[in-house]
């Protein structure tokens, strides 16, 4: 009877389901084993690599013996020294590559190789092992054949010597080298699966990519060669030019200016010791020039040899840009030196002007200014700064004959021109002046120099000043001198009132001159003075005496000039508004004949500050250093101020011309200003004019000066007698808003009249005084319904 074989029971569903997670965990376990193997292999390879690189022949090893107690130099210790000695003796220099190869093989064996170039079929561990062994044999033999150094082991070690000797004996030197190279390539393929066709393909791609790069380099080399040829040609041209220059006449060099300006008669008188010491108490005496600092001796500018060298450099630099020109003259000055250039026929001035920065770079200077037109000459000017800049003192200018011979009490000492001659200007001929420049360009110092030049020229009987100083720093130092019409204005609301007073004074003077029959202030003063000298003083035609009060007719007196200084009118326009611009424009249009003149200064030369209305009425301008050509065109309607040197270097545009003059401003210290101010304070008390800063400026005929400078009706005095007062009162009490602009808009009246109505309500207790934010509270109850 056949034995019945028991039937295998099928696995239960629960068991089979329990095995599925184990199968799923197999890749995770394999990854874990690979990571552990890599962690174990990496330190061994590092140890082997360190032992090889720190090998020392003095250490005991396989090929030599040493003392047991002697120190071991190898980082791997005695074991490392033995291993390194064995590997180096067996494999030679290939031993250093052995850890890297073993590491790469371990990585491939553990993680696989999924990159391009991997053989599609799995070669198996046997072939990989064969490839590794073949690589060791081939590399040792190759090194022994190519790098034999005479040692016993040689570069390829004992193994390399055996392989190379065996192959050389059978195949000769050529056959041995070819056999070793082929074996090396095949073993690399077997060990790594690398495809040499892929390697050749990649090398081909690199070669193709290298083509455009080589083409670019070749193009650059060609350009360099052409540049070198052009440079050699220029050198040849320069040599020819040098021969021509040796035969040409030297540049005409004007002598430098004298360091000391010739003193005037007044300066000589001030140096004499007076017989009677004392100070005038009526302010009629002018301050002595001894209050100012004397100029100090300073270094000279360029020498004649340096000027000649600079002339040649300018010509060579222009020739680099294919511009033929010849320097025909050099004019050294205290701050800059002007070179006069005569361009060749057909050369445009714009070609030279566009090279100002390149010329400055070529001459190693800060900036170069190109003067397109020099009156009376057919040359172009190049203004180059001196290495050592001369400081110009205000005392030099005020002691000069040019300043002393000027009969006008409004003489301004601006500075020195490029030749070192004093530059003075008459404010009465300008008749107004606009000064603009960036911060630190010397604008404030120039304004102080202008003020002092007026104070040293005219007494307070001949000249009065109104100073507006929004910054409260520059002009406030003059507080208390007899020349001021009012205290130095720092509140911009009072500044607008002061300008309205000037408009009212201008209109009053015009009426006086019309009644007397003269055309300007000088004629008026001459006629009044002649009448006084004849013993028949002229009576004031505008004064209406009141017989009931016993008033007698008032005789006319000479009128002083009035100069209005505004240090930063950009801030004033921002605070007060556009109405100040209209007041300034009205004064600039009509105030010349009345003897009222404006000097405006700003550090923000933008079109919203220096507007077309101001520029049209103030043609005389001074531009200090600015940051761009746009700012220069805003001030002067032409470029050039951006190339100035700062510290008082300016372009002065005189009246009646479009060609600015370069002037170097005078320096005046704070100590000098304080000494002059203290002297003027001691010479006479202040004589402020009443009502200069009042908000309402009447013109004597029942009208007042409006916000724009035009006359407006007083509206019955601006109190409760105004016919619109009741209507304005109703509007304010109904709306509960005491706003000047609201009353002005609802009643369609002027700003000044609306302001007077609000002030009348304040006086009557209807509204409160303005609070810190300008708002008023309506105190009166609303009208009954």
From Swiss-Prot:
Keyword Cell cycle: yes
Protein residues bound to ATP: 440-445
Pfam families: FtsK_4TM (PF13491), FtsK_alpha (PF17854), FtsK_gamma (PF09397), FtsK_SpoIIIE (PF01580)
Biased composition annotated in UniProt, kind: Basic and acidic residues: 1-13
Molecular function in Gene Ontology: ATP binding; ATP hydrolysis activity; DNA binding; DNA translocase activity
Main location: membrane
Every FtsK domain range: 420-633
Residue ranges of the region described as Disordered: 1-26
Location relative to the cell: Cell inner membrane
UniProt-listed CDD domains: TrwB_TraG_TraD_VirD4
Regions that span the bilayer: 36-56, 91-111, 123-143, 152-171, 179-199
GO cellular component, one term: plasma membrane
GO biological process, one term: chromosome segregation
Keyword terms, alphabetized: ATP-binding, Cell cycle, Cell division, Cell inner membrane, Cell membrane, Chromosome partition, DNA-binding, Membrane, Nucleotide-binding, Transmembrane, Transmembrane helix
Topological domain spans for side Cytoplasmic: 200-785
Membrane topology: Multi-pass membrane protein
Quaternary context: Homohexamer. Forms a ring that surrounds DNA.
Family, similarity comment: Belongs to the FtsK/SpoIIIE/SftA family.
Domain comment as written in the entry: Consists of an N-terminal domain, which is sufficient for the localization to the septal ring and is required for cell division, followed by a linker domain, and a C-terminal domain, which forms the translocation motor involved in chromosome segregation. The C-terminal domain can be further subdivided into alpha, beta and gamma subdomains. The alpha and beta subdomains multimerise to produce a hexameric ring, contain the nucleotide binding motif and form the DNA pump.
Functional note: Essential cell division protein that coordinates cell division and chromosome segregation. The N-terminus is involved in assembly of the cell-division machinery. The C-terminus functions as a DNA motor that moves dsDNA in an ATP-dependent manner towards the dif recombination site, which is located within the replication terminus region. Translocation stops specifically at Xer-dif sites, where FtsK interacts with the Xer recombinase, allowing activation of chromosome unlinking by recombination. FtsK orienting polar sequences (KOPS) guide the direction of DNA translocation.
Name under which the protein is recorded: DNA translocase FtsK
Gene name of this polypeptide: ftsK
């Amino acid at each position: 009877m056949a034995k019945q074989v028991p039937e295998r029971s099928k696995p239960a569903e629960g068991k089979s389901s329990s095995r599925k997670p184990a199968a799923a965990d197999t890749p995770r376990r394999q990854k874990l084993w690979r990571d552990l193997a890599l962690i174990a292999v990496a330190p061994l390879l590092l140890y082997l690599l360190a032992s090889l690189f720190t090998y020392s022949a003095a250490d005991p090893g396989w090929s030599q013996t040493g003392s047991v107690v002697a120190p071991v130099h190898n980082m791997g210790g005695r074991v490392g020294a033995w291993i390194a000695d064995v590997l180096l003796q067996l494999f030679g220099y290939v031993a250093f590559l052995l850890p890297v190869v073993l590491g790469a093989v371990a990585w491939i064996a553990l993680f696989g190789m999924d990159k391009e170039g991997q053989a599609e079929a799995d070669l198996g561990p046997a072939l990989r092992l064969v490839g590794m062994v073949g690589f060791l044999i081939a590399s040792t033999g190759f090194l022994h054949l190519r790098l034999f150094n005479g040692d016993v082991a040689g570069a390829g070690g004992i193994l390399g010597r055996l392989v190379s000797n065996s192959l050389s004996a059978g195949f000769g030197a050529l056959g041995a080298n070819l056999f070793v190279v082929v074996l090396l390539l095949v073993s690399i393929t077997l060990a790594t699966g690398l495809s040499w066709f892929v390697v050749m393909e990649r090398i081909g791609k690199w070669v193709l990519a290298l083509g455009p790069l080589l083409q670019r380099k070749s193009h650059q080399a060609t350009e360099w060669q052409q540049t070198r040829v052009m440079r050699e040609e220029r050198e040849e041209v320069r040599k020819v030019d040098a021969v021509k220059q040796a035969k040409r006449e030297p540049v005409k060099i004007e002598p430098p200016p004298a360091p000391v300006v010739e003193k005037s008669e007044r300066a000589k008188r001030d140096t004499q010791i007076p017989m009677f010491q004392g100070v005038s108490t009526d302010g009629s005496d002018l301050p002595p020039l001894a209050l100012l600092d004397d100029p100090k001796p300073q270094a000279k500018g360029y020498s004649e040899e340096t000027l000649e060298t600079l002339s040649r450099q300018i010509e060579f630099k222009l020739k680099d840009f294919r511009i033929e020109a010849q320097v025909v003259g050099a004019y050294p000055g205290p701050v800059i030196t002007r070179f006069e250039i005569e361009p060749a026929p057909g050369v445009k001035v714009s070609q030279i002007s566009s090279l100002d920065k390149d010329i400055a770079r070529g001459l190693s200077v800060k900036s170069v200014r190109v003067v397109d037109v020099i009156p009376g000459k057919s040359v172009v000017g190049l203004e180059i700064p001196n290495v050592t800049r001369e400081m110009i003192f205000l005392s030099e200018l005020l002691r000069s004959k040019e300043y002393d011979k000027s009969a006008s009490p409004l003489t301004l000492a601006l500075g020195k021109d490029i030749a070192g001659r004093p530059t003075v200007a008459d404010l009465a001929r300008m008749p107004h002046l606009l000064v603009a420049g960036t911060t630190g360009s010397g604008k404030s110092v120039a304004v102080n120099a202008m003020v002092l030049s007026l104070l040293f020229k005219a007494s307070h009987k001949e000249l009065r000043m109104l100073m507006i100083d929004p910054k409260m720093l520059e002009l406030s130092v003059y507080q208390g001198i007899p020349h001021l019409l009012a205290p130095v204005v720092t509140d911009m609301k009072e500044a607008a009132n002061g300008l309205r007073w000037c408009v009212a004074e201008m209109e009053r003077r015009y009426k006086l001159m019309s009644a007397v029959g003269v055309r300007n202030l000088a004629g008026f003063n001459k006629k009044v003075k002649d009448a006084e000298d004849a013993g028949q003083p002229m009576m004031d035609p505008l004064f209406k005496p009141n017989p009931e009060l016993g008033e007698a007719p008032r005789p006319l007196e000479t009128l002083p000039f009035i100069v209005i200084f505004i240090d930063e009118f950009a801030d004033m326009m921002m605070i007060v508004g556009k109405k100040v611009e209209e007041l300034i424009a009205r004064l600039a249009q009509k105030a010349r004949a009345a003897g009222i003149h404006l000097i405006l200064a700003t550090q923000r030369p933008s079109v919203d500050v220096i507007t077309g209305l101001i520029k049209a009425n103030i043609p005389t301008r001074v531009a200090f250093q600015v940051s761009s050509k746009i700012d220069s065109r805003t001030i002067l309607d032409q470029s050039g101020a951006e190339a100035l040197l700062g510290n008082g270097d300016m372009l002065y545009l005189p009246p009646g011309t479009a060609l600015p003059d370069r002037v170097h401003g005078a320096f005046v210290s704070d100590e000098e200003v304080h000494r002059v101010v203290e002297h003027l304070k001691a010479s006479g008390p202040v004589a402020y004019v009443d009502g200069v800063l009042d908000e309402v400026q009447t013109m004597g005929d029942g009208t007042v000066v409006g916000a724009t400078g035009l006359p407006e009706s007083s509206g019955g005095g601006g109190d409760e007698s105004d016919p619109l007062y009741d209507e304005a009162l109703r509007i304010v009490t109904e709306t509960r808003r005491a706003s000047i602009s609201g009353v002005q808009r609802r009643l369609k009246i002027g700003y000044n009249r609306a302001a007077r109505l609000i002030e009348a309500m304040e006086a009557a207790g209807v509204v409160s005084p303005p609070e810190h934010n300008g708002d008023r509270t309506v105190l009166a109850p609303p009208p009954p319904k």
